[in-house]
Amino acid sequence: MATTKALHLTRCTLYVAPPQQLANNRHTHGSRFRGRHVDRLRLLDESVKDNEHIIKLTDNAQKKIKQLAAETEGESLILKLSVKNGGCKGLQYKLNPIRKDEIEADDYVQQFEELKFILSIDATSVIYIYSNILDYSYDLINGGFKFINPNATKKCGCGKSFNV
């Protein structure tokens, strides 16, 4: 596997609730987060406080991001990462370009100045993204960004769908 570089996530400056309230925030996370999910939220809170790794980028992902950022004509490339219901295993990754004003107040945000890249992770999706590796495949069939998720109990062969 290609070498990885860490992606450290920080809270968007507009976020008003402290990270330790994440596990108790029923409005954001709903009642479906119990047991191991709450444990994962606690680990995430500790990681954000200690500025530890949330997600990693492989060399291939970094190369593709640099290429996409070069096409933005001086602006930083901003991608929104979220997890939605769907796909063949129940949950599906969504990675879409957005404008800076579309970053939501409770998103986890990371800037990669050397890549001219900003990653905005939806607050309700962060629990599923924790410890993932973002890779890029140049394969003709099923090429594109792929997620390697060590938390997934079921995975789709395409790398875009999973379950926990």
From Swiss-Prot:
One of its GO terms (cellular component) is apicoplast. It comes from the Eukaryota. InterPro entries: FeS_biogenesis, FeS_cluster_insertion, FeS_cluster_insertion_CS, HesB-like_dom_sf, ISCA_plant_cyanobact. It is found in: Plastid, Apicoplast. Pfam families: Fe-S_biosyn (PF01521). GO terms for molecular function: 4 iron, 4 sulfur cluster binding; metal ion binding; protein-macromolecule adaptor activity. One of its GO terms (biological process) is iron-sulfur cluster assembly. Keywords: 4Fe-4S, Apicoplast, Iron, Iron-sulfur, Metal-binding, Plastid. Pathway: Cofactor biosynthesis; iron-sulfur cluster biosynthesis. [4Fe-4S] cluster binds at residues 88, 156, 158. Belongs to the HesB/IscA family. Homodimer. Participates in the sulfur mobilization (SUF) pathway for iron-sulfur (Fe-S) cluster biogenesis. Involved in the pre-assembly of [4Fe-4S] clusters and their transfer to target proteins. This is Iron-sulfur cluster assembly protein SufA. It comes from Plasmodium vivax. The gene is SufA.
